[in-house]
UniProtKB/Swiss-Prot annotation:
Species this protein is from: Herminiimonas arsenicoxydans
Membrane topology (Cytoplasmic): 1-7, 58-63, 156-158
Name of the gene this protein is made from: dsbB
Segments traversing the membrane: 8-24, 43-57, 64-81, 137-155
Chief place of localization: membrane
The protein, known as: Disulfide bond formation protein B
Pfam families: DsbB
Record topology, Periplasmic segments: 25-42, 82-136
Length: 158
């Protein structure tokens, strides 16, 4: 039987590294996160948490965890896709005002404001990183992570 634990640890590590990159961009490069960015951060955090918790359980639980984390990744991909659409159509609003958002009143945002507080606007343009915008990179990573997790969750037992 193949072990899901290495994949879950790798995905958790990748998700935590992506959150670290987000913190670097926010605090060093002064790229303020918008509400959609923060929702994507929640998705990466959920993926990491689910993977870490279920990696220490039985193989069946690890596979269930991989499926749940894949759902979180697909949800994050949906948010990233919406964010890309908004950036491509500046007249469209994300519908979330960062100054009045209930997103900033969630207990985790109060506990970790340096990571989960939305201060920027969804349509703010920042310089691309290696040719892609931040939401485009997030979408790429959400898809890659989802593919690994779906393969782990649904592969045949050997």
């Amino acid at each position: 039987m193949k072990n899901s634990r290495p994949v879950l640890f790798a995905v958790a590590l990748a998700s935590l590294l992506l959150l670290a990159v987000a913190l670097y961009l926010q605090h060093v490069e002064n790229m303020l996160p918008c509400p959609l960015c923060v929702i994507q951060r929640y998705a990466f955090a959920a993926i990491a948490l689910i993977c870490l918790v279920t990696a220490f359980r039985t193989e069946v639980t690890a596979r269930i965890g991989a499926a749940l984390a894949a759902l979180a990744s697909l949800a994050g991909a949906g948010v990233a896709g919406w964010h890309i659409y908004i950036k491509a159509h500046p007249t469209v609003s994300c519908g979330i005002d960062p100054l009045e958002t209930s997103l900033n009143t969630i207990p985790t945002a109060k506990l970790l404001p340096f990571l989960l507080q939305a201060d920027g606007l969804c349509t703010t343009e920042y310089a691309p990183i290696m040719g892609l915008s931040i939401p485009q990179w997030a979408l790429v990573w959400f898809i890659v992570i989802a593919l690994f997790l779906l393969h782990t969750a649904f592969r045949k037992k050997s």
